[in-house]
Structure formats: C-alpha cells, structure tokens
C-alpha cells in the first residue's frame, strides 16, 4: 500500500513538473543554440521611415570568433549591401556604388540588431523588466532596445515558435507602432561555409568587383554607404 501511494505521489510530481517550461528555460535553450559554432538565416526586413516603407531581403551568416556576413538587398531597386566583420575589421561592400568601406567599429555589439540572433538574445537577457507570455503555442518577449541613432525605437516584441526558433520581431515606438519588422523565413544552426567565405576578397569577388584601394582624408571625400553601422568611423575606402 505504501509503495502504491509513493508511486502515485511520484506520478503527480512528475505531471506537475511537466508544463512548467518558463522564460528562463527558453533563454537557456536559445543560448545553447546560438552559442554554437555557426548559423545561417534568411528573412525579410521592413523599415518604416515617416511615409516611406523600405523592404529588404536579409541573409545572415555567422561563424564563431566574430565572423559575420550580412546581405541586405533592397527589393525596390535590387541594390545590395554586404556588412562583413572578421579579424581584420568591419567592412561595408556596396556593388551598386562600386565601392567598399572599412570602419572602426564595435559592430554588432554597440547597439541592438534586429537581424542578429546574438543581439536579440542579449536584449532579452539584459532587460530585467522584460515581459514574457505564451500565446497560440508561441513564446513572446517584450524588451527594451538600444538604437542610439534612432530614439523613436524604444521596445520590441519577439515571437519565438514552439520549436524555439525566432519567428518575427517588431521594433516599436512609444505608441506601440512597428517601425521595423523582421520576419525570419529560415534558420540553420548547422550550416557549412566555404573556405575564405568571411574574407573581404571573397565577398568582393562574389559581387564581381575590382580590388582597388583609395585612401580617404575625410568622411566628406567619400560616398556614404546605404547602410552605415552605428558608432562607426570610416578609415578606408576601396573602389570595387
């Protein structure tokens, strides 16, 4: 009889324990996935600026030890920019302008980045006042954001699927209006990248560009790239 009661109590404890998956469990699981050696994702980014709406096709490649390659393709004019970070620095390659730029920058760690998983996870972890809920089988975080160059952006809603993959992120103003929306279409946590994939020459060759270097005396002497990481200082410009 005692054994029967013991097993009944054990079953109740186990059943009670099930379903108590909370935000800390989710954060831990996301951290394990994102901290792996690499990932690749694709998605669509919509940016609202006053009466203008810009849509970008986004592709992000990440390899451990601070290697990032981000492609932003403007859907309206088919112009692409590639942000590259490796051991040599931060670069922006702009094929439409036949130029590449090298910057002194802490990118992507100096502010929020809606299309980088590490950045979004850091926003979640660093916000002690974050809100968390479960809705329609998905998990939803609401956190503060850090966009020093755009004070209109104050918070974000992060939707994560039941499979623990990022689904959609809305960056909101103080009235709760979405000014940036990132829809994730594909996330691969076990990608394979070709050799030298994160080297500048490889990026320039893939964009069919020449490797001609031009020294720049001041920012005014250069044509600014369409996408400029926050907190950057131009140090070099190359004709591509």
Residue map of PLM features:
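Beta-turn initiation residues at beta-strand->coil junctions
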Residues: 45-47, 72-74, 92-96, 145, ...
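An acidic-aromatic
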Residues: 61-115, 177-181
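Flexible, processing/modification-adjacent segments and terminal tails
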Residues: 87-154, 215, 228
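Sec-dependent bacterial lipoprotein signal peptides
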Residues: 1-16
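Short, cysteine-centered beta-strand-loop-beta hairpins and adjacent loop/turn segments enriched
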Residues: 49-52, 77, 148-152
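Short, solvent-exposed coil/turn segments at beta-strand boundaries
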Residues: 34-38, 61-69, 84-89, 135-136, ...
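N-terminal leader/targeting segments and the immediate start of mature chains
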Residues: 14-67, 128-131, 212-217, 221-233, ...
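Gly/Pro-enriched, hydrophobic low-complexity segments
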Residues: 136-205, 209
């Amino acid at each position: 009889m005692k054994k029967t009661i013991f097993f009944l109590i054990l079953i109740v404890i186990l059943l009670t324990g099930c379903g108590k998956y909370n935000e800390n469990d989710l954060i831990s699981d996301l951290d394990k996935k994102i901290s792996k050696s690499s990932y690749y994702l694709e998605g669509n980014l919509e940016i609202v600026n006053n009466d203008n709406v810009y849509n970008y096709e986004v592709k992000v490649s990440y390899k451990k030890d601070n290697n990032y390659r981000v492609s932003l393709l403007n859907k309206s004019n088919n112009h692409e920019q590639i942000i590259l970070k490796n051991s040599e620095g931060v670069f922006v390659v702009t094929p439409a302008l036949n130029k590449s730029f090298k910057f002194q920058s802490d990118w992507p760690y100096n502010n929020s980045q809606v299309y980088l998983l590490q950045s979004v996870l850091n926003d979640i972890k660093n916000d002690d006042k974050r809100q968390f809920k479960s809705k329609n089988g998905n998990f939803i975080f609401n956190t503060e954001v850090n966009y020093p160059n755009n004070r209109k952006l104050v918070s974000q809603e992060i939707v994560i699927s039941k499979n623990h993959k990022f689904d959609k992120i809305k960056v909101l103003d103080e009235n709760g209006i979405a000014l940036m929306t990132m829809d994730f279409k594909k996330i691969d946590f076990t990608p394979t990248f070709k050799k030298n994939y994160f080297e500048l020459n490889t990026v320039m060759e893939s964009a069919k560009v020449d490797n001609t270097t031009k020294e720049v005396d001041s920012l005014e002497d250069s044509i600014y790239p369409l996408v400029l990481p926050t907190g950057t200082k131009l140090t070099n410009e190359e004709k591509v």
